[in-house]
């Protein structure tokens, strides 16, 4: 039997990659290939009160759950529909109080177990790939990853034992490994984290650093649209990672999270690497060793900053960004991706501190190189135009604001589809100013 999903696509065996998704008909840029409802999903804790727990709608005046006072809903219908999942957490949140702190992965996995019990047969999210078929890469897990899974299993038992029956430890190890490899993060139009989910049919797609589709979200529905022309017989590729970085960094990330090395055209030719690690034009050009050392420093500082976010103050974080940029600028151009990474982090800190002018200054330096380094239709570029547009509008520069927001819309009409609520909201922002 040929496994066909929404017309025009089939599951097939991709040489050297295992399972994959292939087009049976042509798709133009902006065409919707398919959509997939979430099999299981969870709203991130920090977005409670901003979004409905059930449908992820973003609106004012949501009603809170009368029992736990932690979950918010559009109306009684959303609350009732969400109860089979919310009941896993409602009374435990009251009982544990401040000590209720399972990770998002644990929360999502609890919901998968509940879903499997409520709905053991195949769901509309699994037209081409069932959750139980997910790759776990169990044989490739190192001790550190196994230890992390064991601590997740302990937390699952600790917080969810009242409302869930658990399979044995080995089955839970497999399930957590599957979630780690196949889970998705749902993000909003500015790429802020909204939650985590499982979209089985979307997980069927293999990775490429020059993807021909992009995945976006409409509430808890994933939508897959073409960002390149796709011909019948061609494989459908998405990107699993941020494509800003040079080949070696991308593959380090892919090996660490997904256990493979990419061999797409971008990785084989390394065409963009030179521009991505642009070296400052000096009368006395830096030696190869100096460049190597600075790349090593850049990677270390990126990791140091990622950790520091959890415990340092905004002003300390800004200092790390500024000092590292100063040091790197002796060797790197401003358009170098390691410089851009720290500028982006600095912009984020400025936004957090409500330093709108500071955020705008960083955004203005980032946007042109971003447009060069990323693919043509990139959510990273769209979200940067969006942030810039909103900053300009807030600082009363309407003309620049409108220009930037229109650039964001041009990308989003392809990536999200012309009828996406985000696009109507942005058009509204332009009109109301």
Curated annotation (Swiss-Prot):
GO terms for molecular function: histone H3K36 methyltransferase activity; histone H3K4 trimethyltransferase activity; protein-lysine N-methyltransferase activity; RNA polymerase II complex binding; zinc ion binding. Its EC number is 2.1.1.-, 2.1.1.354. The keyword Cell membrane does not apply. It holds the Pfam family zf-MYND. It is found in: Cytoplasm, Cytosol; Nucleus. A zinc finger (MYND-type) spans 52-90. Zn(2+) 1 binds at residues 52, 55, 74, 78. GO terms for biological process: negative regulation of cell population proliferation; negative regulation of transcription by RNA polymerase II; peptidyl-lysine dimethylation; peptidyl-lysine monomethylation; regulation of DNA damage response, signal transduction by p53 class mediator. Its main location: cytoplasm. SUPFAM superfamilies: SET domain, TPR-like. Transmembrane segments: none annotated. Keywords: Chromatin regulator, Cytoplasm, Metal-binding, Methyltransferase, Nucleus, S-adenosyl-L-methionine, Transcription, Transcription regulation, Transferase, Zinc, Zinc-finger. It catalyses: L-lysyl(4)-[histone H3] + 3 S-adenosyl-L-methionine = N(6),N(6),N(6)-trimethyl-L-lysyl(4)-[histone H3] + 3 S-adenosyl-L-homocysteine + 3 H(+); L-lysyl-[protein] + S-adenosyl-L-methionine = N(6)-methyl-L-lysyl-[protein] + S-adenosyl-L-homocysteine + H(+). Residues 7-241 form the SET domain. GO terms for cellular component: cytoplasm; cytosol; nucleus. S-adenosyl-L-methionine binds at residues 17-19, 137, 206-207, 258-260. It comes from the Eukaryota. Zn(2+) 2 binds at residues 65, 68, 86, 90. Protein-lysine N-methyltransferase that methylates both histones and non-histone proteins, including p53/TP53 and RB1. Specifically trimethylates histone H3 'Lys-4' (H3K4me3) in vivo. The activity requires interaction with HSP90alpha. Shows even higher methyltransferase activity on p53/TP53. Monomethylates 'Lys-370' of p53/TP53, leading to decreased DNA-binding activity and subsequent transcriptional regulation activity of p53/TP53. Monomethylates RB1 at 'Lys-860'. PANTHER family: HISTONE-LYSINE N-METHYLTRANSFERASE SMYD, N-LYSINE METHYLTRANSFERASE SMYD2. Interacts with RNA polymerase II and HELZ. Interacts with SIN3A and HDAC1. Interacts (via MYND-type zinc finger) with EPB41L3. Interacts (via SET domain) with p53/TP53. Interacts with RB1 and HSP90AA1. Belongs to the class V-like SAM-binding methyltransferase superfamily. This is N-lysine methyltransferase SMYD2. It comes from Bos taurus (Bovine).
